[in-house]
């Protein structure tokens, strides 16, 4: 609670300073939900730090101030088991709060590294977490009480209107990880999930179209690297 109190004081002070400099300036207030370990000199995500971020989001909602936080940032060594649990915890907590903008997706190793596979896996997490966040409608139109009464016990709902309408979207289908039975997984060569993710990521990168300003953007980046690091390119 003390950390949250100090955080609110810092954020609101920043708001006052920004409006003093330029009245009406647009601003987002928020935090990176991390602790800093003085022994290792590293920051890291933690359930408590993410909880403080959620509380910060609720306070920004109370003040009617736009909020930003992270969703899918992790402390793993790339896209690994360490990162996966943090991505889920970070994303779901933000969606269950009053979170707004969520930059900083897919970083690892103290935000010094980004692996393309992290973006693809985070997309999976965000897609599923949004379904939890959106919930479902519990009303007469969606509860299908009339159909249940009409069909009666011991019969099939396969040809009922609600089934025909929703059977393609009634449950989540991953765009990355197939639902293998043990037999099909063995027939596929027993691939590790990380290998499947890597292949999907490579396919996406190979099929992605470069933006119109790609050549100009890359040229500027290479020129900056040459000036800073001389003959590295």
Which residue stretches match the model-derived regions?
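Catalytic-core signal marking the mid-to-C-terminal active-site face
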Residues: 117-233
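A glycine-rich phosphate-binding loop feature that marks nucleotide/adenosyl-phosphate handling sites
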Residues: 31-38, 70-79, 108-113, 144-153, ...
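Short acidic (Asp/Glu) and glycine-rich catalytic loops that position anionic groups and cofactors
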Residues: 33-36, 67-71, 102-112, 175-182, ...
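Helix-rich catalytic cores of soluble enzyme domains
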Residues: 1-96, 100
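Metal-ion/cofactor- or nucleotide/acyl-coenzyme-handling active-site neighborhoods
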Residues: 79-91, 96, 111-137
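Long, contiguous hydrophobic alpha-helical segments, chiefly transmembrane helices and signal peptides
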Residues: 12, 67-72, 88, 93, ...
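Residue-level preference for alpha-helix termini and adjacent loops
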Residues: 3-4, 16, 35, 108, ...
């Amino acid at each position: 609670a003390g950390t949250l109190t100090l955080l609110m004081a810092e954020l609101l002070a920043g708001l006052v300073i920004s409006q003093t400099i330029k009245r009406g300036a647009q601003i987002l207030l928020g935090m990176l939900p991390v602790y800093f370990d003085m022994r290792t000199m590293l920051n890291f995500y933690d359930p408590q730090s993410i909880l403080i971020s959620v509380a910060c989001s609720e306070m920004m909602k109370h003040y009617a101030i736009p909020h930003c936080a992270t969703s899918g940032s992790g402390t793993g060594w790339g896209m690994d088991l360490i990162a996966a649990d943090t991505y889920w915890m970070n994303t779901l907590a933000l969606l269950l709060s009053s979170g707004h903008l969520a930059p900083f997706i897919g970083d690892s190793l103290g935000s010094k590294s980004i692996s393309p596979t992290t973006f693809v896996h985070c997309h999976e997490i965000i897609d599923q977490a949004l379904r939890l966040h959106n919930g479902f409608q519990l009303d007469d139109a969606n509860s299908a009480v009339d159909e249940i009464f009409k069909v009666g016990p011991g019969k099939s709902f396969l040809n009922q209107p609600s089934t025909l309408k929703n059977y393609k979207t009634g449950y989540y289908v991953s765009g990355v990880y197939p639902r293998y039975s043990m037999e099909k997984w063995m027939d596929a060569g027993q691939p590790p999930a990380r290998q499947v993710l890597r292949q999907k990521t490579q396919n996406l990168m190979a099929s992605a179209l470069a933006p119109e300003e790609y050549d100009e953007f890359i040229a500027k980046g290479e020129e900056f690297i040459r000036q800073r690091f001389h003959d590295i390119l």
